[in-house]
C-alpha cells in the first residue's frame, strides 16, 4: 500500500517507484482498477482490507473518530486489481474546503476506476449528508463532464449497504428514489435532455451484515463480493466487459500525473484527450527505442555490406530487422489508443524505410551498372559486317530484354514488400537502346558504304562507256542507268536489313552517293569534250554508213556531209553544257548537282573555236581528193575515138585469128569465175586503177599548156598555205592533232609533187614545139633529175594516188570562201 495523492493534493514522488514495485509497469493491460468513496469513518478502508486483503490504515477505536485516510491511497492484490482508497467526504478536518477536494477526488476515481464503490450505511439511507447525496450529486455531474460525449462503456456504481437488515429490494428502491431526486436537480447539456441516469451508469447493490455483530456472515458475504472482482467464472463478474478506462501499466504513472494536474488546475478534464496525449508520448518513446535498435543492427548487417558488388541478402536481412522492430513496438504500443499506436507505427515504418532506401537504391544501382557493363560488352562483340550476320537487331533487343528483366527481378528480390520503393530502370533502358541504335546505325552506314563501293566500280565503267559514246540519248541512258543502279543497290541493302533489323530501311543517302558518283564521272568526261567532238565528227565525216573508211567520189556533196558531221560534234558540246540527270518533271531544288552547269560560256566558246579550226583541215583535204578524182575520171570523147581508130587493126586481127577468140572466151570465163566468187570487184578496182594511171599520163601530155600554167600557181599557193597552218599547229604541241597534221603534210607533199610534174610537163611540151628540135627526132628526152622527198605511205593516205592535173577553178574559189568564213567565226 502507498499514498499516491497526499493531503495537500500533490502527487507523491514515490508513485513511479510504487507502480514499478507492484509490477504494474510490465502488466500492460492485464490488470483492473476500482475505487471507493463514502463519508469519513464509514469503514471504507476496513471493507477493502476484508475484501482484497489489503493493508489500508483503519480507524483506531481507542482514539475515536477522526480522519484516517488522507488524500488517495493505492494497493494491489494478488489478482491484479489496483484499488484506490479515496479520502472520506464530510470530514471535520477539511471543513468548507471539503467540497472542492471531494469533487477532485470524485473526478480522479471516475477517471481511473472501472468500478466505483459507494460505501453506505443502511441507517443513513434517506438522510442528506449521511447518505452521501451531495457526493452522489458530484459523481453524476463529474461523470457527465467526463463521459457524456464519449462512446465508452457505462460507469459501474456499486452501492455496498453496510449493516443491512432489511430486504434488498426495499433498500434498492429507496436508494434509487434518492438517485432519481438527485438526477432531477442535475443540469443536463442540451444534447442530453431527456436522458435518465440509467443511460450513464450501471447500478449494483450488495448488502453486508454487521461486522461485529455477525462476523461470520460478514466474512461470507465479503468473500462472495470479493469473488465478483477476482473470479471470472463468478456470476456478476464486474470486469467481464472492458470499459475502456484502463491505461497500459507502463504509462499509468504519467497518466495519473496528467489527470491530477488537470483536476488541480480546474481545467476541463478531457479523458480521451488525456489518453491520446499519453498514448502519443508513450508510443513515440516506443518507436524511438525500436528505431534506434533497428538502426544499429541495419548499419552493421546491411549498410556496411554494400560495396562494389550487389548484396543479395538485402531483402532477407532487411525484412527480418524490420519485422523485429515493428514487433518490439507493437508489444508495447498496442496497449494504448489504437489510432495513436497505428500512427506511430506508420511513422516508425517510414523512418525505417527512409533509412534503408538509400542502401536499396545503391544496391540496385550497383547491379544495374554491372548488367549495363555486360550488355555493352555483348553489343561490342556483335559482328559489324551485316552482310555476314543474321538477326543482328533481334539478338540485341533480346539481350536488352534479358538485361532489363534481370534488373527488374533483382529489384523485386531486394525490395521489402512493406516499403513502396521505386527503382527507375527507364533511364538504363533508354541508354541501352541508344547504344543498340548507335551501334546498328554505324554498322548499317558501313554496310551501305561497302555495297556502294563494290557496285560503284562496275557502275562507273558503264557510265564512262555511255559518256564516251556520247549518243544523242546520253542523258536518258545516264538517268536510266543511275535509276536502275540505285534501285538494285537499295534492293540489295534492303535484303541485308531485313535479315538483321526489325524495321529499318535503306538510307536516302544511297541516291545522293550515286548522284555524286555520276556527277564526278561527268566532270571527268567534260575535260575531253573537244576530243569527243572531233571523234564524232570524224566518225560521221570520214566513215560511211557501214562505219568503213569513206572513199570520196566525184559526185559526193562534201559540204552537206561536212555540215552534218559538224552538227553531230556540236551536239556533244550542247549535251555537256548542263547536267540533265534529274528526271523530267520533278521539282528542282536549289544548288542541285543533277541540273548544274557543266561548262561555262567562256569554256564553251573556247572549245567551239578549237573544234572549228581542227575540222577545217579535214574539209579541205576531202575537197582536194574529190577534185583529183574528177581529173582522173574526165577522159575526152575524142580520146576514145583516137583509141578506136588506132586499135582497129588489132580488133580485125582478133577476129581473123581463132586462137585470139579462144583467149577472149577464156578471159570471159575468168571474169565470170571472179564474179561468181565475189572477187570481180576487187580485180576491176585494181585494173581500173592501173588504167586510170595510164590515161592520166596520156591526158597530161595532151592538155593545153596555158590551162596547166593557170592552175599550177593556185595549187601551189593553197598547198603552201595549208602547210603553214599545219606547222603552226605543230608548234602549239597539240598531241590530239597529230594524225590530222600528218594527213595535211601528206596532202601538201602530194600537191607539191603535182606542181612539179605540171612544171615538167610544161617544159616537155615547150621542147616539143620548139623549132630548134626536129619532130621526127628519135632521140629520147633526158630523164628528169630525181627529187629527194620523204616517201609517203600509200596504205592509209587517201591522197597517195592523187596525180597532178587541172582542178576546177570554181571549187578552189568555194574552198577559199569556206576558209574565210571559218576564220570569221573564229574571230
Curated annotation (Swiss-Prot):
Subcellular localization, as worded in the UniProt entry: Endoplasmic reticulum membrane
Pfam family, one: RHD3_GTPase
Coiled-coil annotated residue ranges, if any: 322-346, 384-407, 475-501, 805-826
Lumenal side: 656-658
Single GO cellular component term: endoplasmic reticulum membrane
Xref: InterPro entries: G_GB1_RHD3_dom, P-loop_NTPase, RHD3/Sey1, Sey1/RHD3-like_3HB
EC number(s) given by UniProt: 3.6.5.-
Protein name from the UniProt record: Protein SEY1 homolog 3
Organism for this UniProt entry: Trichomonas vaginalis (strain ATCC PRA-98 / G3)
Amino acid at each position: 500500500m502507498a499514498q499516491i495523492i497526499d493531503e495537500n493534493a500533490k502527487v507523491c514522488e514515490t508513485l513511479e517507484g510504487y507502480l514499478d514495485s507492484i509490477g504494474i509497469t510490465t502488466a500492460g493491460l492485464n490488470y483492473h482498477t476500482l475505487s471507493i468513496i463514502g463519508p469519513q469513518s464509514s469503514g471504507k478502508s476496513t471493507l477493502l482490507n476484508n475484501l482484497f486483503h489489503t493493508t489500508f490504515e483503519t480507524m483506531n477505536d481507542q482514539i475515536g473518530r477522526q480522519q484516517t485516510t488522507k488524500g488517495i491511497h493505492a494497493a494491489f492484490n494478488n489478482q491484479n486489481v489496483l484499488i484506490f482508497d479515496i479520502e472520506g467526504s464530510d470530514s471535520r478536518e477539511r471543513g468548507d474546503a471539503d467540497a472542492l477536494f471531494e469533487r477532485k477526488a470524485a473526478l480522479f476515481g471516475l477517471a481511473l476506476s472501472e468500478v466505483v464503490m459507494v460505501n453506505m450505511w443502511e441507517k443513513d439511507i434517506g438522510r442528506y449528508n449521511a447518505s452521501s447525496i451531495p457526493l452522489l450529486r458530484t459523481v453524476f455531474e463529474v461523470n457527465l463532464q467526463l463521459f457524456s460525449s464519449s462512446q465508452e462503456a457505462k460507469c459501474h456504481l456499486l452501492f455496498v449497504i453496510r449493516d443491512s437488515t432489511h430486504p434488498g429490494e426495499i433498500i434498492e428502491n429507496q436508494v434509487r428514489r434518492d438517485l432519481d431526486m438527485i438526477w432531477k436537480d442535475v443540469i443536463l447539456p442540451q444534447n442530453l435532455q431527456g436522458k435518465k441516469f440509467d443511460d450513464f451508469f450501471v447500478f449494483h447493490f450488495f448488502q453486508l451484515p454487521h461486522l461485529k455483530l455477525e462476523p461470520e456472515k460478514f466474512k461470507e458475504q465479503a468473500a462472495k463480493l470479493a469473488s465478483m472482482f477476482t473470479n471470472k467464472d463468478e456470476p456478476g463478474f464486474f470486469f467481464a466487459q472492458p470499459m475502456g478506462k484502463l491505461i497500459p501499466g507502463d504509462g499509468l504513472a504519467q497518466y495519473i500525473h496528467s489527470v491530477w494536474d488537470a483536476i488541480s488546475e480546474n481545467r476541463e478534464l478531457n479523458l480521451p484527450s488525456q489518453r491520446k496525449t499519453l498514448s502519443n508520448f508513450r508510443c513515440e518513446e516506443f518507436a524511438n527505442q525500436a528505431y534506434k535498435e533497428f538502426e544499429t543492427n541495419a548499419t552493421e548487417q546491411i549498410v556496411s555490406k554494400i560495396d562494389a558488388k550487389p548484396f543479395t541478402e538485402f531483402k532477407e536481412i532487411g525484412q527480418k530487422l524490420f519485422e523485429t522492430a515493428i514487433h518490439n513496438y507493437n508489444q508495447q504500443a498496442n496497449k494504448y489508443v489504437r489510432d495513436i499506436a497505428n500512427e506511430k507505427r506508420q511513422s516508425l515504418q517510414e523512418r525505417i524505410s527512409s533509412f534503408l532506401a538509400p542502401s536499396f537504391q545503391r544496391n540496385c544501382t550497383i547491379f544495374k551498372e554491372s548488367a549495363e557493363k555486360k550488355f555493352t560488352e555483348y553489343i561490342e562483340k556483335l559482328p559489324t559486317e551485316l552482310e555476314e550476320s543474321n538477326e543482328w537487331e533481334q539478338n540485341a533487343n533480346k539481350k536488352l530484354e534479358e538485361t532489363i528483366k534481370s534488373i527488374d527481378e533483382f529489384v523485386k528480390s531486394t525490395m521489402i514488400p512493406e516499403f513502396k520503393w521505386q527503382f527507375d530502370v527507364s533511364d538504363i533502358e533508354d541508354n541501352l537502346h541508344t547504344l543498340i541504335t548507335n551501334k546498328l546505325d554505324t554498322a548499317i552506314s558501313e554496310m551501305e558504304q561497302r555495297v556502294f563501293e563494290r557496285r560503284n566500280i562496275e557502275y562507273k565503267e558503264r557510265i564512262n562507256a555511255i559518256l564516251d559514246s556520247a549518243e544523242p540519248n546520253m542523258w536518258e541512258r545516264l538517268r536510266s542507268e543511275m535509276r536502275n543502279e540505285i534501285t538494285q543497290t537499295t534492293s540489295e541493302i534492303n535484303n541485308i536489313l531485313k535479315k538483321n533489323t526489325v524495321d529499318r530501311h535503306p538510307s536516302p543517302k544511297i541516291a545522293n552517293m550515286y548522284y555524286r558518283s555520276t556527277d564526278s564521272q561527268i566532270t571527268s568526261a567534260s575535260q575531253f569534250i573537244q576530243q569527243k567532238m572531233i571523234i564524232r565528227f570524224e566518225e560521221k565525216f570520214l566513215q560511211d554508213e557501214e562505219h568503213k573508211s569513206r572513199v570520196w567520189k566525184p559526185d559526193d556533196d562534201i559540204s552537206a556531209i561536212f555540215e552534218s558531221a559538224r552538227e553531230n560534234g556540236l551536239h556533244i558540246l550542247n549535251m555537256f553544257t548542263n547536267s540533265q540527270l534529274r528526271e523530267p518533271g520533278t521539282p528542282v531544288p536549289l544548288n542541285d548537282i543533277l541540273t548544274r552547269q557543266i561548262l561555262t560560256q567562256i569554256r564553251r566558246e573556247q572549245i567551239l573555236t578549237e573544234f572549228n579550226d581542227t575540222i577545217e583541215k579535214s574539209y579541205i583535204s576531202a575537197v582536194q581528193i574529190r577534185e583529183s578524182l574528177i581529173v582522173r575520171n574526165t577522159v575526152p570523147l575524142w580520146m576514145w575515138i583516137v583509141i578506136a581508130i588506132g586499135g582497129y587493126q588489132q580488133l580485125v586481127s582478133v577476129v581473123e585469128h581463132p586462137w585470139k577468140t579462144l583467149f577472149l572466151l577464156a578471159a570471159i570465163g575468168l571474169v565470170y569465175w571472179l564474179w561468181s566468187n565475189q572477187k570481180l570487184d576487187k580485180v576491176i578496182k585494181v585494173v581500173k586503177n592501173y588504167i586510170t594511171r595510164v590515161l592520166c599520163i596520156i591526158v597530161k601530155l595532151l592538155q593545153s599548156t596555158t590551162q596547166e600554167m593557170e592552175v599550177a600557181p593556185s595549187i601551189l599557193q593553197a598547198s603552201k598555205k595549208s602547210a603553214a597552218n599545219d606547222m603552226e599547229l605543230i608548234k602549239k604541241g597539240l598531241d590530239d592533232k597529230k594524225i590530222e597534221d600528218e594527213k595535211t603534210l601528206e596532202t601538201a607533199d602530194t600537191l607539191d609533187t603535182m606542181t612539179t610534174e605540171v612544171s615538167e610537163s610544161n617544159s616537155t611540151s615547150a621542147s616539143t614545139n620548139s623549132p630548134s628540135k626536129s619532130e621526127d627526132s628519135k632521140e629520147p628526152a633526158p630523164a628528169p633529175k630525181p627529187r629527194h622527198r620523204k616517201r609517203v605511205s600509200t596504205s592509209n593516205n587517201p591522197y597517195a594516188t592523187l596525180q597532178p592535173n587541172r582542178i576546177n577553178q570554181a571549187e578552189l574559189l568555194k574552198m577559199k570562201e569556206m576558209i574565210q568564213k571559218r576564220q570569221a567565226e573564229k574571230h
